[in-house]
Protein backbone atom coordinates (compact mmCIF):
# COMPACT_ATOMS: atom_id res chain seq x y z
CA UNK A 1 0.00 0.00 0.00
CA UNK A 2 2.81 2.40 0.87
CA UNK A 3 3.98 2.38 -2.76
CA UNK A 4 0.62 3.39 -4.25
CA UNK A 5 1.59 7.05 -4.25
CA UNK A 6 4.15 6.24 -6.94
CA UNK A 7 1.50 5.49 -9.57
CA UNK A 8 0.81 9.15 -10.50
CA UNK A 9 4.55 9.75 -10.89
CA UNK A 10 4.98 6.67 -13.05
CA UNK A 11 2.07 7.78 -15.19
CA UNK A 12 3.68 11.18 -15.75
CA UNK A 13 7.01 9.55 -16.60
CA UNK A 14 5.29 7.25 -19.07
CA UNK A 15 3.93 10.31 -20.88
CA UNK A 16 7.15 12.31 -20.84
CA UNK A 17 8.30 13.87 -24.15
CA UNK A 18 10.88 11.12 -24.63
CA UNK A 19 8.13 8.51 -24.69
CA UNK A 20 5.35 10.65 -26.14
CA UNK A 21 4.73 8.26 -29.02
CA UNK A 22 3.70 5.55 -26.55
CA UNK A 23 1.13 7.65 -24.65
CA UNK A 24 -2.53 6.92 -24.71
CA UNK A 25 -4.51 9.00 -27.25
CA UNK A 26 -5.57 12.47 -26.16
CA UNK A 27 -9.31 12.07 -25.91
CA UNK A 28 -10.13 15.71 -26.69
CA UNK A 29 -8.27 15.27 -29.98
CA UNK A 30 -10.07 12.00 -30.64
CA UNK A 31 -13.38 13.78 -30.13
CA UNK A 32 -12.48 16.49 -32.62
CA UNK A 33 -11.23 14.02 -35.18
CA UNK A 34 -14.23 11.67 -34.94
CA UNK A 35 -17.10 14.06 -34.22
CA UNK A 36 -15.74 17.51 -35.03
CA UNK A 37 -14.17 17.25 -38.44
CA UNK A 38 -17.06 15.03 -39.47
CA UNK A 39 -19.83 12.65 -38.42
CA UNK A 40 -22.14 14.98 -36.51
CA UNK A 41 -25.74 16.06 -36.79
CA UNK A 42 -27.21 19.49 -37.54
CA UNK A 43 -30.41 18.70 -35.69
CA UNK A 44 -31.79 15.83 -37.82
CA UNK A 45 -29.37 16.19 -40.73
CA UNK A 46 -26.21 14.11 -40.70
CA UNK A 47 -23.01 15.88 -41.72
CA UNK A 48 -20.16 13.74 -43.01
CA UNK A 49 -17.54 16.51 -43.15
CA UNK A 50 -17.22 19.90 -41.45
CA UNK A 51 -15.31 21.59 -44.26
CA UNK A 52 -18.15 21.15 -46.78
CA UNK A 53 -21.07 21.66 -44.40
CA UNK A 54 -23.50 24.52 -45.00
CA UNK A 55 -24.19 27.49 -42.73
CA UNK A 56 -26.15 26.49 -39.62
CA UNK A 57 -25.96 27.26 -35.92
CA UNK A 58 -25.12 23.62 -35.10
CA UNK A 59 -22.34 23.29 -37.67
CA UNK A 60 -21.16 26.74 -36.60
CA UNK A 61 -20.99 25.64 -32.98
CA UNK A 62 -19.00 22.54 -34.00
CA UNK A 63 -16.66 24.70 -36.09
CA UNK A 64 -16.15 27.12 -33.21
CA UNK A 65 -15.34 24.21 -30.89
CA UNK A 66 -12.84 22.79 -33.38
CA UNK A 67 -11.22 26.22 -33.66
CA UNK A 68 -10.90 26.40 -29.87
CA UNK A 69 -9.35 22.92 -29.88
CA UNK A 70 -6.86 24.08 -32.51
CA UNK A 71 -5.79 26.95 -30.22
CA UNK A 72 -4.98 24.30 -27.59
CA UNK A 73 -3.21 22.04 -30.13
CA UNK A 74 -1.75 24.42 -32.74
CA UNK A 75 0.24 21.59 -34.28
CA UNK A 76 -3.09 20.15 -35.50
CA UNK A 77 -3.25 22.27 -38.65
CA UNK A 78 -6.08 20.13 -40.03
CA UNK A 79 -8.36 21.58 -37.34
CA UNK A 80 -7.77 25.15 -38.47
CA UNK A 81 -7.95 24.23 -42.15
CA UNK A 82 -11.35 22.54 -41.69
CA UNK A 83 -12.82 25.58 -39.93
CA UNK A 84 -11.42 27.94 -42.55
CA UNK A 85 -12.86 25.77 -45.32
CA UNK A 86 -16.25 25.75 -43.57
CA UNK A 87 -16.18 29.56 -43.41
CA UNK A 88 -15.02 30.01 -46.99
CA UNK A 89 -17.68 27.57 -48.19
CA UNK A 90 -20.35 30.07 -47.06
CA UNK A 91 -18.65 33.36 -47.99
CA UNK A 92 -18.21 35.29 -51.19
CA UNK A 93 -14.75 36.55 -52.10
CA UNK A 94 -14.68 39.65 -49.89
CA UNK A 95 -16.96 38.55 -47.03
CA UNK A 96 -19.83 40.86 -47.90
CA UNK A 97 -22.28 38.00 -48.43
CA UNK A 98 -22.93 34.84 -46.40
CA UNK A 99 -24.86 32.20 -48.34
CA UNK A 100 -26.50 28.88 -47.62
CA UNK A 101 -26.07 25.70 -49.66
CA UNK A 102 -28.58 26.97 -52.21
CA UNK A 103 -26.64 30.18 -52.72
CA UNK A 104 -29.25 32.33 -50.99
CA UNK A 105 -28.71 34.73 -48.10
CA UNK A 106 -27.94 32.62 -45.03
CA UNK A 107 -28.92 35.47 -42.71
CA UNK A 108 -32.70 35.35 -42.89
CA UNK A 109 -34.52 38.51 -41.74
CA UNK A 110 -34.62 38.70 -37.92
CA UNK A 111 -33.72 35.05 -37.41
CA UNK A 112 -31.29 35.00 -34.51
CA UNK A 113 -30.41 31.32 -35.06
CA UNK A 114 -28.56 32.30 -38.25
CA UNK A 115 -25.95 34.41 -36.46
CA UNK A 116 -23.79 32.37 -34.04
CA UNK A 117 -21.83 30.47 -36.71
CA UNK A 118 -20.11 33.81 -37.26
CA UNK A 119 -18.23 33.47 -33.97
CA UNK A 120 -15.49 31.67 -35.93
CA UNK A 121 -14.67 34.81 -37.90
CA UNK A 122 -12.81 36.41 -35.00
CA UNK A 123 -10.37 33.53 -34.58
CA UNK A 124 -9.87 33.27 -38.33
CA UNK A 125 -9.25 37.02 -38.52
CA UNK A 126 -6.59 36.86 -35.79
CA UNK A 127 -4.76 33.92 -37.34
CA UNK A 128 -4.75 35.37 -40.86
CA UNK A 129 -3.42 38.65 -39.47
CA UNK A 130 -0.72 36.71 -37.61
CA UNK A 131 0.25 35.03 -40.87
CA UNK A 132 0.33 38.40 -42.63
CA UNK A 133 -2.55 37.67 -44.99
CA UNK A 134 -4.41 40.94 -44.54
CA UNK A 135 -6.73 40.27 -47.49
CA UNK A 136 -8.07 37.06 -45.92
CA UNK A 137 -8.24 38.73 -42.51
CA UNK A 138 -10.24 41.61 -43.97
CA UNK A 139 -12.73 39.12 -45.44
CA UNK A 140 -13.44 37.65 -42.01
CA UNK A 141 -13.68 41.05 -40.34
CA UNK A 142 -16.15 42.13 -43.03
CA UNK A 143 -18.27 39.01 -42.48
CA UNK A 144 -18.29 39.50 -38.69
CA UNK A 145 -19.26 43.14 -39.18
CA UNK A 146 -22.08 42.13 -41.53
CA UNK A 147 -23.58 39.90 -38.82
CA UNK A 148 -23.13 42.47 -36.07
CA UNK A 149 -24.77 45.20 -38.14
CA UNK A 150 -27.67 42.96 -39.19
CA UNK A 151 -28.33 42.28 -35.52
CA UNK A 152 -27.85 45.81 -34.21
CA UNK A 153 -29.59 47.79 -36.93
CA UNK A 154 -31.96 45.45 -38.78
CA UNK A 155 -33.15 42.79 -36.33
CA UNK A 156 -36.74 43.22 -35.11
CA UNK A 157 -37.13 44.32 -31.49
CA UNK A 158 -39.89 44.67 -28.94
CA UNK A 159 -41.21 48.23 -29.17
CA UNK A 160 -42.41 50.58 -26.44
CA UNK A 161 -44.78 50.78 -24.65
CA UNK A 162 -44.58 46.98 -24.39
CA UNK A 163 -42.46 45.58 -21.56
CA UNK A 164 -38.97 44.58 -22.61
CA UNK A 165 -38.70 47.30 -25.25
CA UNK A 166 -35.44 47.06 -27.18
CA UNK A 167 -35.03 43.30 -26.77
CA UNK A 168 -34.44 41.26 -29.93
CA UNK A 169 -37.16 38.96 -31.25
CA UNK A 170 -36.11 35.33 -31.36
CA UNK A 171 -37.41 35.18 -34.93
CA UNK A 172 -39.57 37.39 -37.14
CA UNK A 173 -42.24 34.68 -37.11
CA UNK A 174 -42.33 34.88 -33.29
CA UNK A 175 -42.99 38.60 -32.70
CA UNK A 176 -42.26 39.98 -29.23
CA UNK A 177 -40.89 36.63 -28.06
CA UNK A 178 -37.52 36.31 -26.33
CA UNK A 179 -36.08 32.83 -25.86
CA UNK A 180 -33.23 31.99 -23.51
CA UNK A 181 -31.30 30.14 -26.23
CA UNK A 182 -31.76 33.15 -28.51
CA UNK A 183 -29.63 35.19 -26.16
CA UNK A 184 -26.84 32.66 -26.78
CA UNK A 185 -27.31 33.04 -30.53
CA UNK A 186 -26.91 36.80 -30.75
CA UNK A 187 -25.18 38.42 -27.78
CA UNK A 188 -21.75 36.70 -27.89
CA UNK A 189 -20.95 37.70 -31.46
CA UNK A 190 -22.22 41.23 -30.76
CA UNK A 191 -19.99 41.42 -27.67
CA UNK A 192 -16.95 39.96 -29.42
CA UNK A 193 -17.27 42.44 -32.27
CA UNK A 194 -17.44 45.35 -29.85
CA UNK A 195 -14.43 44.08 -27.90
CA UNK A 196 -12.31 43.61 -31.01
CA UNK A 197 -13.42 46.37 -33.37
CA UNK A 198 -15.75 48.67 -31.44
CA UNK A 199 -13.15 50.98 -29.95
CA UNK A 200 -12.89 52.84 -33.25
CA UNK A 201 -16.09 54.76 -32.33
CA UNK A 202 -16.40 55.50 -28.60
CA UNK A 203 -19.99 56.76 -28.69
CA UNK A 204 -21.25 53.82 -30.74
CA UNK A 205 -19.23 51.40 -28.60
CA UNK A 206 -20.79 52.64 -25.37
CA UNK A 207 -24.28 52.48 -26.87
CA UNK A 208 -23.65 48.97 -28.14
CA UNK A 209 -22.47 47.64 -24.78
CA UNK A 210 -25.58 49.15 -23.19
CA UNK A 211 -27.64 47.40 -25.87
CA UNK A 212 -25.96 44.07 -25.10
CA UNK A 213 -26.54 44.54 -21.37
CA UNK A 214 -30.21 45.33 -22.06
CA UNK A 215 -30.69 41.89 -23.63
CA UNK A 216 -29.39 40.18 -20.48
CA UNK A 217 -31.31 42.42 -18.09
CA UNK A 218 -34.59 41.96 -19.93
CA UNK A 219 -34.57 38.18 -20.16
CA UNK A 220 -33.47 37.91 -16.53
CA UNK A 221 -36.07 40.39 -15.30
CA UNK A 222 -38.98 38.58 -16.92
CA UNK A 223 -37.92 34.92 -16.98
CA UNK A 224 -36.08 34.32 -13.69
CA UNK A 225 -37.79 32.31 -10.97
CA UNK A 226 -35.94 33.15 -7.76
CA UNK A 227 -37.50 30.30 -5.83
CA UNK A 228 -36.35 27.71 -8.38
CA UNK A 229 -33.19 29.69 -9.24
CA UNK A 230 -33.85 28.99 -12.91
CA UNK A 231 -34.90 30.97 -15.97
CA UNK A 232 -37.97 29.91 -17.92
CA UNK A 233 -37.14 28.90 -21.47
CA UNK A 234 -39.03 31.77 -23.10
CA UNK A 235 -40.95 34.95 -22.41
CA UNK A 236 -43.31 36.99 -24.58
CA UNK A 237 -44.26 40.64 -24.19
CA UNK A 238 -47.65 39.84 -25.75
CA UNK A 239 -48.93 36.62 -24.14
CA UNK A 240 -52.42 37.28 -25.50
CA UNK A 241 -51.19 36.86 -29.10
CA UNK A 242 -52.25 33.70 -30.90
CA UNK A 243 -48.58 33.04 -31.62
CA UNK A 244 -47.89 33.01 -27.88
CA UNK A 245 -50.37 30.23 -27.12
CA UNK A 246 -47.73 28.49 -24.99
CA UNK A 247 -47.31 31.37 -22.53
CA UNK A 248 -48.67 31.58 -19.00
CA UNK A 249 -51.61 33.98 -19.19
CA UNK A 250 -51.67 35.29 -15.64
CA UNK A 251 -49.82 35.27 -12.37
CA UNK A 252 -46.33 36.35 -11.36
CA UNK A 253 -44.75 34.78 -14.44
CA UNK A 254 -47.27 35.95 -17.01
CA UNK A 255 -45.76 35.65 -20.48
CA UNK A 256 -43.28 32.93 -19.49
CA UNK A 257 -43.26 29.41 -20.83
CA UNK A 258 -44.64 26.92 -18.31
CA UNK A 259 -41.40 24.91 -18.34
CA UNK A 260 -37.71 25.29 -17.73
CA UNK A 261 -35.42 23.72 -20.34
CA UNK A 262 -32.08 22.27 -19.24
CA UNK A 263 -30.41 22.82 -22.61
CA UNK A 264 -31.33 26.50 -22.75
CA UNK A 265 -29.99 26.95 -19.21
CA UNK A 266 -26.74 25.40 -20.43
CA UNK A 267 -26.59 27.85 -23.32
CA UNK A 268 -27.35 30.68 -20.93
CA UNK A 269 -24.40 29.79 -18.68
CA UNK A 270 -22.12 29.43 -21.71
CA UNK A 271 -23.10 32.80 -23.10
CA UNK A 272 -22.53 34.52 -19.75
CA UNK A 273 -18.95 33.25 -19.85
CA UNK A 274 -18.45 33.97 -23.56
CA UNK A 275 -19.84 37.51 -23.42
CA UNK A 276 -17.93 38.34 -20.23
CA UNK A 277 -14.71 36.98 -21.75
CA UNK A 278 -15.17 39.30 -24.73
What are the language-model segments listed below?
Residues 13-14:
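C-terminal motif of bacterial Sec signal peptides marking the signal peptidase cleavage site
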Residues 20-101, 137-141, 145-146, 150, ...:
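Low-complexity, Ser/Thr/Pro/Gly-enriched N-terminal "stalk/linker" regions
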Amino acid sequence: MKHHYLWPILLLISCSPAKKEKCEPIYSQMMVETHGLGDFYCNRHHQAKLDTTGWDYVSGLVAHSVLKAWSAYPEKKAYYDAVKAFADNSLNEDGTFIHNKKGKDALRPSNIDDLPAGNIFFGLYEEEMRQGDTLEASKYKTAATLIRNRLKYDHSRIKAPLPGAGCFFHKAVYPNQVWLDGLFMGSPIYAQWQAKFGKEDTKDNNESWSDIALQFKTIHQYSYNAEKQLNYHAWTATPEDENSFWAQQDGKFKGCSPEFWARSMGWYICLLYTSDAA
